[in-house]
């Protein structure tokens, strides 16, 4: 600061010595010349700015701001890459879920077909069992009816035999009647 004051006094002394009748202009050093005074004030202002390191501070601030912007850009790039990674991961998971749902649908259809075939086979077995049971019942009813016919035929034969015996028929007539009764029973059974 001492040097600046000495420089200012040195530059201003010829202007003070010249007085008011000195020529005007920027290159005419006179304190009465406003252009010269403004130039000196501006130079003094610049000197003060440089003395206190304002350009370095401004440069540092601008560099810090540029570094901040650069770090924000790097962070934005990193976030973008992370977002792309997450997007790819979600797309992959979506494909996996879609494939899994397709597999589940395929398995469900296969299980439904298997269950339908199993139900059909169970129904066929049930029908076969019921038919067999019905046939057994029919055979049992036929056997029962056959026994009833035999019993009736035997009763008729016994009654006929009783009449023959009671009527006093001959032995040949009795044999003939017995043979006829046996043939009648045979016809009724078949």
From Swiss-Prot:
InterPro entries: ATP_synth_b/b'su_bac/chlpt, ATP_synthase_B_chain. Its main location: membrane. The keyword Cell inner membrane applies. It holds the Pfam family ATP-synt_B. GO terms for cellular component: plasma membrane; proton-transporting ATP synthase complex. It is a single-pass membrane protein. The keyword Cell membrane applies. The chain crosses the membrane at residues 35-55. GO terms for molecular function: proton-transporting ATP synthase activity, rotational mechanism; proton-transporting ATPase activity, rotational mechanism. Keywords: ATP synthesis, Cell inner membrane, Cell membrane, CF(0), Hydrogen ion transport, Ion transport, Membrane, Transmembrane, Transmembrane helix, Transport. Disulfide bonds: none annotated. It is found in: Cell inner membrane. Belongs to the ATPase B chain family. F-type ATPases have 2 components, F(1) - the catalytic core - and F(0) - the membrane proton channel. F(1) has five subunits: alpha(3), beta(3), gamma(1), delta(1), epsilon(1). F(0) has three main subunits: a(1), b(2) and c(10-14). The alpha and beta chains form an alternating ring which encloses part of the gamma chain. F(1) is attached to F(0) by a central stalk formed by the gamma and epsilon chains, while a peripheral stalk is formed by the delta and b chains. F(1)F(0) ATP synthase produces ATP from ADP in the presence of a proton or sodium gradient. F-type ATPases consist of two structural domains, F(1) containing the extramembraneous catalytic core and F(0) containing the membrane proton channel, linked together by a central stalk and a peripheral stalk. During catalysis, ATP synthesis in the catalytic domain of F(1) is coupled via a rotary mechanism of the central stalk subunits to proton translocation. This is ATP synthase subunit b 1.
């Amino acid at each position: 600061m001492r040097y600046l004051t000495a420089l200012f006094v040195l530059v201003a002394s010829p202007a003070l010595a010249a007085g008011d009748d000195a020529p005007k202009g920027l290159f005419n050093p006179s304190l009465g010349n406003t252009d010269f005074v403004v130039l000196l004030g501006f130079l003094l202002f610049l000197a003060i700015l440089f003395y206190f390191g304002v350009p370095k501070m401004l440069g540092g601030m601008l560099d810090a701001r540029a570094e901040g912007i650069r770090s924000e850009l790097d962070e934005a790039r990193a976030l973008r890459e992370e977002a792309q990674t997450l997007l790819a991961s979600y797309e992959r998971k979506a494909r996996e879920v879609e494939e899994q749902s397709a597999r589940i649908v395929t398995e469900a259809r296969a299980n439904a077909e298997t269950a339908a075939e199993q139900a059909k086979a169970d129904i066929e077995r049930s029908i076969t069992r019921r038919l067999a049971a019905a046939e057994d019942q029919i055979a049992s009813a036929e056997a029962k009816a056959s026994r009833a016919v035999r019993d009736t035929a035997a009763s008729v034969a016994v009654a006929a035999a009783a009449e023959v015996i009671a009527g006093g028929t001959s032995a040949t007539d009795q044999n003939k009647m017995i043979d006829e009764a046996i043939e009648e029973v045979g016809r009724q059974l078949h």
